[in-house]
């Protein structure tokens, strides 16, 4: 199923936690909400950012959306009302990434070209913490308990920050180019990273993991001169991983064997973001060709 309507590159998309909706956004500064079933019609458009939206995520309960934009702000959106309820200011350059806490109180973390990571409590006016990184930050995510923020940037290292001490707990070294996407596994034990060195890596982020935390290196997809922030994702059961690719294909691998299970064609531009449906064998991809594909994959027993 092809979903059309965006006027520019699509940078980010995600299924609703219950699976009935899909949200997408990108260069045109608009957030589209689509029905996943039936005719897949566009049911609402949210506007308010004055710059490209680099990343969006649903809140765990599915009632809100979080967005990061090149207008240097984060947005917190009420999906039912179709309005932005909070505009979080503080970054001094493009915001490349946003992530929400999986459980507990609503917290957001963000990463920016201003070389900071910020952790926000949207119920309070200002941000909670600022973590100073030396280089631009391109991807962030919380760990499972939201006591740590995991960040990636143009210095090739993934950093795990302890929010109680405001310091780096440890670094995950191995990528040889910019980190473009980070995704925490469904069980919270592993982090998936996508980088311009044309590899995906899986890292063990459990507290007492062995010293060598890189457990898998996966390849097959491509990055190119466009330097888009190609994201990555886990299937709900953790058995598959997927990544954006500049060669116009949507790749899905088996997590254990690292084998390419699917190389899905159709796009005419870089595939920037992908997602797995939370309940069914459906995947989606968003591309610089302004189009979204929804497709079914077979369930491998």
Could you tell me what each predicted segment is?
Residues 1-7, 215:
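A short helix->beta-strand "capping" segment at the edge of beta-propeller domains
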Residues 13-19, 57-62, 99-105, 141-147, ...:
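Loop/turn segments within WD40 beta-propeller blades
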Residues 24-28, 67-71, 110-114, 122, ...:
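Conserved strand-to-loop turn within each blade of WD40 beta-propeller repeats
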Residues 33-55, 59-63, 73-97, 101-107, ...:
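Per-blade loop-tip surfaces of WD-repeat and WD-like beta-propellers in eukaryotic adaptors/scaffolds
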Residues 190-207:
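C-terminal amphipathic alpha-helical segment
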Residues 223-252:
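Loop/turn-rich, solvent-exposed surfaces of beta-rich toroidal or solenoidal domains
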Residues 275-301:
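Blade-level signature of beta-propeller repeat domains, shared across WD40, Kelch, NHL, RCC1
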């Amino acid at each position: 199923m092809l979903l059309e309507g965006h006027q520019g590159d699509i940078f980010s998309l995600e299924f609703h936690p219950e699976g009935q909706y899909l949200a997408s956004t990108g260069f045109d500064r608009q957030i589209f909400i689509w029905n996943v079933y039936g005719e897949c019609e566009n049911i609402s458009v949210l506007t308010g950012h004055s710059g490209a939206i680099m990343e969006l995520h649903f809140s765990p309960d599915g009632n809100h959306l979080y967005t990061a934009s090149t207008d240097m702000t984060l947005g917190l959106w009420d999906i039912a009302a179709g309005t932005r309820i909070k505009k979080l200011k503080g970054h001094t350059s493009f915001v490349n990434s946003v992530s929400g806490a999986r459980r507990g109180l609503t917290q957001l973390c963000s990463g920016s070209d201003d070389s900071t990571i910020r952790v926000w409590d949207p119920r309070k006016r200002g941000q909670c913490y600022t973590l100073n990184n030396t280089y631009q930050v391109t991807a962030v995510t919380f760990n499972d308990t939201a006591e740590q923020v995991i960040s990636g940037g143009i210095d090739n290292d993934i950093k795990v920050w302890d929010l109680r001490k405001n310091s780096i707990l440890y670094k995950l070294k191995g990528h040889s180019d910019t980190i473009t996407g980070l995704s925490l596994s469904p069980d919270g034990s592993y982090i998936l990273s996508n980088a311009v060195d044309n590899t995906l890596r899986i890292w063990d982020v459990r507290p007492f993991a062995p010293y060598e935390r890189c457990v898998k290196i996966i390849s097959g997809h491509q990055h190119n001169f466009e330097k888009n922030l190609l994201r990555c994702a886990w299937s709900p059961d953790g058995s598959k991983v997927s990544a954006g690719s500049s060669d116009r294909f949507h790749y899905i691998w088996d997590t254990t064997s690292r084998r390419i299970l699917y190389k899905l064609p159709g796009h005419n531009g870089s595939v920037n973001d992908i997602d797995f449906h939370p309940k069914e064998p459906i995947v989606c991809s968003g591309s610089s060709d302004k189009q979204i594909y929804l497709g079914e994959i077979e369930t491998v027993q």
